[in-house]
Amino acid sequence: MARRPHNAPPQRETGPRVNERIRCPEVRLIGANGENIGVVTPSRAMMMAEEAGLDLVEISPNAEPPVCKIMDFGKFKYEQQKREAEARKKQHIIEIKEIKFRPGTDTHDYDVKMRSVLKFLSEGDKVKVTLRFRGREMAHQELGLELLNRVAAHVSEAEAGKVEAMPKLEGRQMVMMIAPK
């Protein structure tokens, strides 16, 4: 066991109360097979759990009286961890990927970048398409807008996503957001 600093508060136990930790005058007991036994004292419930070779676990502490069940606590914790891991595995964090273009981006470079855009959208990520202007290119913003409109048309044609934020100028760059369908 690791030492804790003398000024740190003691660790609070999380999770349901088990066996002797259940301190209340009476509990509503559910048997090992799921049958409702009724309202009994915690000591009587503990005896019944010991006879069955299982634990007494507080399922619903906020109920009146608290609901307890006779079950194998180790198995219960294992099942709970398995469910949480499954839920974590299923959830997907949406990331924002950025693809940078220039007003003079040529056809091959455009095709390569568009493949990346479509790949990111198929993986469920949002794509931020950035068009960077340098020097005198700022005078020809219509070329940049034309390129971004071409990107938007390409994405909607491939039915991979939809434009979430239309192109807008932010300083020396034009930005457009595309979300997956």
Swiss-Prot record:
<dbReference type="GO" id="GO:0016020">
    <property type="term" value="C:membrane"/>
</dbReference>
<dbReference type="GO" id="GO:0003743">
    <property type="term" value="F:translation initiation factor activity"/>
</dbReference>
<comment type="similarity">
    <text>Belongs to the IF-3 family.</text>
</comment>
<dbReference type="GO" id="GO:0043022">
    <property type="term" value="F:ribosome binding"/>
</dbReference>
<keyword id="KW-0648">Protein biosynthesis</keyword>
<protein>
    <recommendedName>
        <fullName>Translation initiation factor IF-3</fullName>
    </recommendedName>
</protein>
<dbReference type="GO" id="GO:0032790">
    <property type="term" value="P:ribosome disassembly"/>
</dbReference>
<comment type="function">
    <text>IF-3 binds to the 30S ribosomal subunit and shifts the equilibrium between 70S ribosomes and their 50S and 30S subunits in favor of the free subunits, thus enhancing the availability of 30S subunits on which protein synthesis initiation begins.</text>
</comment>
<dbReference type="InterPro" id="IPR036788">
    <property type="entry name" value="T_IF-3_C_sf"/>
</dbReference>
<dbReference type="Pfam" id="PF00707">
    <property type="entry name" value="IF3_C"/>
</dbReference>
<dbReference type="InterPro" id="IPR019815">
    <property type="entry name" value="Translation_initiation_fac_3_C"/>
</dbReference>
<comment type="subunit">
    <text>Monomer.</text>
</comment>
<dbReference type="InterPro" id="IPR019813">
    <property type="entry name" value="Translation_initiation_fac3_CS"/>
</dbReference>
<keyword id="KW-0963">Cytoplasm</keyword>
<dbReference type="InterPro" id="IPR001288">
    <property type="entry name" value="Translation_initiation_fac_3"/>
</dbReference>
<dbReference type="GO" id="GO:0005829">
    <property type="term" value="C:cytosol"/>
</dbReference>
<dbReference type="InterPro" id="IPR019814">
    <property type="entry name" value="Translation_initiation_fac_3_N"/>
</dbReference>
<dbReference type="InterPro" id="IPR036787">
    <property type="entry name" value="T_IF-3_N_sf"/>
</dbReference>
<dbReference type="Pfam" id="PF05198">
    <property type="entry name" value="IF3_N"/>
</dbReference>
<keyword id="KW-0396">Initiation factor</keyword>
